Amino acid sequence: MTILFLTMVISYFGCMKAAPMKEANARGQGSLAYPAVRTHGTLESVNGPKAGSRGLTSLADTFEHVIEDLLDEGQKVRPDEENSKDADLYTSRVMLSSQVPLEPPLLFLLEEYKNYLDAANMSMRVRRHSDPARRGELSVCDSISEWVTAADKKTAVDMSGGTVTVLEKVPVSKGQLKQYFYETKCNPMGYTKEGCRGIDKRHWNSQCRTTQSYVRALTMDSKKRIGWRFIRIDTSCVCTLTIKRGR
């Protein structure tokens, strides 16, 4: 399983063209540098004939730098109390690609792999009884996840509460790439559209509600200034409860 996971990570970064981290440190609101740029093809076709030989040796460094960059950005910028009520998370759900991504973001795969390692530390008997499928576990709220483009979003709310235009395409050295956002929201066609699953309706009012997180995206404000900003996108479906009065 470990070898399979490492192969998956290598394959993932094999088709990703990351911007140099030295340039990433110098980006501002008007900068177009961004570390998570993905193209399709070999390392040689993207960066020249010498890139293939040094590509594999730099994968670990690239991955480490991208994670550090995301953590640094999360420490520098914090939403205020009013704006963070329904959008208080920092996630990596944005990808620049020439076509629709075929898999969830890499950090999602890393989380699944971590869960596998945690399960591997338990005995076979414990794992068998802890398997949600064996216990018949169901989610409290039904949700759906999909990649959407800026053409679907059009506008978004930034961390200052202002409305900005989400740019559909991002200029790169060899053309343009589209911005894709991995969104998760409550399923309007699911069985929980009338309330959360497993809640006693005699005592509680329940509702499945889509919540948002901040992600970094290329946008344009009302003054036509283009830059990378944190915007809200749908990232989860949670259950909200209120107690019934008069009982």
From Swiss-Prot:
PROSITE patterns: NGF_1, NGF_2
Disulfide bond positions: 141-208, 186-237, 196-239
The keyword Disulfide bond appears for this protein: yes
Residues carrying covalently attached carbohydrate according to the record: 121
Gene3D superfamilies per UniProt: Cystine-knot cytokines
GO CC terms in record: extracellular region
Modification after translation (UniProt): Mature BDNF is produced by proteolytic removal of the propeptide, catalyzed by a FURIN family member. In addition, the precursor form is proteolytically cleaved within the propeptide, but this is not an obligatory intermediate for the production of mature BDNF. Can be converted into mature BDNF by plasmin (PLG).
Matches recorded under InterPro entries: Brain-der_neurotrophic_factor, Cystine-knot_cytokine, Nerve_growth_factor-like, Nerve_growth_factor-rel, Nerve_growth_factor_CS
Site (Cleavage): 57-58
Localization of this protein: Secreted
Pfam families the record matches: NGF
Signal peptide interval: 1-18
GO molecular function: growth factor activity
Subunit-structure text: Monomers and homodimers. Binds to NTRK2/TRKB. Can form heterodimers with other neurotrophin family members, such as NTF3 and NTF4 (in vitro), but the physiological relevance of this is not clear. BDNF precursor form: interacts with the heterodimer formed by NGFR and SORCS2. Mature BDNF has much lower affinity for the heterodimer formed by NGFR and SORCS2.
Function per UniProt: Important signaling molecule that activates signaling cascades downstream of NTRK2. During development, promotes the survival and differentiation of selected neuronal populations of the peripheral and central nervous systems. Participates in axonal growth, pathfinding and in the modulation of dendritic growth and morphology. Major regulator of synaptic transmission and plasticity at adult synapses in many regions of the CNS.
Record-linked PANTHER family: BRAIN-DERIVED NEUROTROPHIC FACTOR, NERVE GROWTH FACTOR NGF -RELATED
Family as reported in the entry's similarity comment: Belongs to the NGF-beta family.
Protein name: Neurotrophic factor BDNF precursor form
Encoding gene (name): BDNF
